[in-house]
Amino acid sequence: ALSSAASDVYKRQGKKAMICVGGGSMKRFGFLDRAVAYLKEAGMEVELFEGIEPDPSVETVMRGAEAMLKFEPDWIIAMGGGSPIDAAKAMWIKYEYPEITFEEMCKVFGIPPLRRKAHFCAISSTSGTATEVTAFSIITDYQKGIKYPIADFEITPDVAIVDPDLAETMPKKLVAHTGMDAMTHAIEAYVSTANCDFTDPLALHAIK
């Protein structure tokens, strides 16, 4: 799946990719090195933004966006769990619109059109958040002690890779936590006031 993702990125005329990752599991299990190798093999220049913390902060988003402005990628690739993918989504907005404030980013469905500078690929290593296919991102302002949702279809990834090889590296505790997270999302979908005849059977099947 990783090699096909690199090929897909290259076919979309990608020349420079920034990979955003978290605390080290992607590197420890060799997936980060594989992704870098596949992208370089496809003729792309690659730069890393590492160390994205769980529940990513506003400060991390701003640092990542600054790194993107310097490197000028045409592809942003987020690898790992929900945190690096959420952080990279927010960095993407700030990269495309350097003048935008965090407060403006948090206006629901208020993000201006993206993809002027870069497209987005999410490679998920966990089963819980499904942020690789959603229009949402959660960023924490630790000074205020508040988690802010960013909600806009503009930040839905262009490419989502769900490779079982990555999920197999999860420790048992994380498997349990993300499994409950996935079930919670299924229950939320079923009881949501925005449900419909199409989503209800999917939600029930997911719960089972």
Functional labels for PLM-detected ranges:
Residues 14-17, 118:
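Nucleotide donor/acceptor-binding cores
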Residues 18-38:
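Glycine-rich phosphate/diphosphate-binding loop of Rossmann-like nucleotide-binding domains
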Residues 59-162:
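Glycine/threonine-rich beta-strand-loop-alpha-helix active-site module
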Residues 33-36, 47, 62-65, 89-92, ...:
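Predominant activation on well-ordered alpha-helical scaffold segments within soluble catalytic domains
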Residues 48-58:
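Short beta->alpha junction loops
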Residues 136-208:
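Carboxylate- and glycine-rich phosphate/diphosphate-binding segment that chelates Mg2+/Mn2+
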Residues 1-6, 10:
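Single conserved hydrophobic/aromatic residue that forms the stacking wall/gate
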Residues 17-22, 47-50, 76-79:
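Short glycine-rich or small-residue beta-strand-to-loop segments that form or flank ligand, phosphate
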